[in-house]
Every structure is written in C-alpha cells, then in structure tokens.
C-alpha cells in the first residue's frame, strides 16, 4: 500500500497550521510550498541547489499575507481549512509518480516536484522565480530510489514489500 511518509505528514500538518494562522478557509498549494521550504530536509536540498531559501519563504509569505484576502474566513469561530481541488490534484500526481517509480511511500520531494505541473499557481511561479530546477529534483529522487534498491539487493535493509 502506498502511503505518505512521516515527514510528509508533518508538512501537511504545517500547511494546515499556516492556513489557520492566516484564518484562510482553504489550504492551497502555496501553503504547502511554504511548509515544504520551511522544512529542514527540503530547505537543505534547495540550499544545496543554490536556492535562496529565505527569499523564497519571504515571497510565499508575502503572497499569502497580501494576495489571499478572498479566502479569509468571515466569522470569528474556529474553523478547519479545506483542501482545494488543485491541492488534491497535486497530491494525486505525487502518489502516481511514486507508484510508477515502484516506491512504497510518497515523499516531500514528490510533492515539491508535483507543484511544477500546476502552471497557473503562484507556487510554481515562485519556484521558477527562485530558479528551482524540476529536473534536478527528479534526478535526486531517481538517484535515491536506485540507491535504496541497491542497498536492498546487497543484503541491506529491504524496503517493505521487497523480500
């Protein structure tokens, strides 16, 4: 069974917290991008690719704070933000990508790569603006998959389902 790894679950929890903090009715791709780039693992990957992570965070936060007034909740009562259709597409795409690569889990990198397909989103715009290269990320995921499979084949710890 394909499932999200623990790090990805934390990303989604933090995405919801970012939306709640701003009283947004919806969790958007931009909330997810913000949670991703604030995550130490993804932040380190982006830093290794020479991305100015601080500038990316600032751009996404500015967007969420100033351009999303139409999704601010009207009432004062606590509410749980809902996922947008584009966020559902993003997650489905990431799960499909992991499945086709023969992996048993979906990672934060899968979600980050999937953002590029949402061409009309500000999240994809910000990634391109900050010169995040989709192919570099895909190559990194592929390399990690090959290394994991090699370890399992050499008597290393087998991945679930590889017995």
Predicted regions located by residue number:
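Histone-fold recognition with a strong bias for associated Lys/Arg-rich disordered tails
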Residues: 1-163
């Amino acid at each position: 069974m394909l499932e999200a790894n623990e790090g990805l679950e934390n990303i989604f929890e933090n995405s919801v917290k970012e939306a709640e903090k701003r009283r947004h009715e919806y969790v958007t791709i931009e909330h997810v991008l913000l949670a991703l780039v604030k995550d130490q693992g993804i932040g380190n990957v982006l830093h290794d690719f020479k991305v100015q992570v601080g500038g990316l965070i600032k751009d996404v936060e500015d967007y969420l704070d100033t351009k999303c007034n139409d999704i601010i909740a009207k009432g004062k009562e606590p509410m749980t933000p809902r996922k947008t259709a584009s966020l559902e597409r993003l997650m489905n795409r990431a799960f499909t990508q992991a499945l086709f690569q023969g992996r048993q889990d979906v990672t934060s990198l899968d979600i980050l790569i999937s953002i590029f397909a949402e061409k009309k989103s500000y999240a994809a715009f910000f990634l391109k603006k900050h010169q995040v290269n989709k192919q570099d990320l895909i190559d990194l995921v592929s390399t990690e998959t090959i290394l994991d499979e090699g370890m399992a084949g050499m008597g290393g710890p087998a991945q679930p389902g590889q017995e």
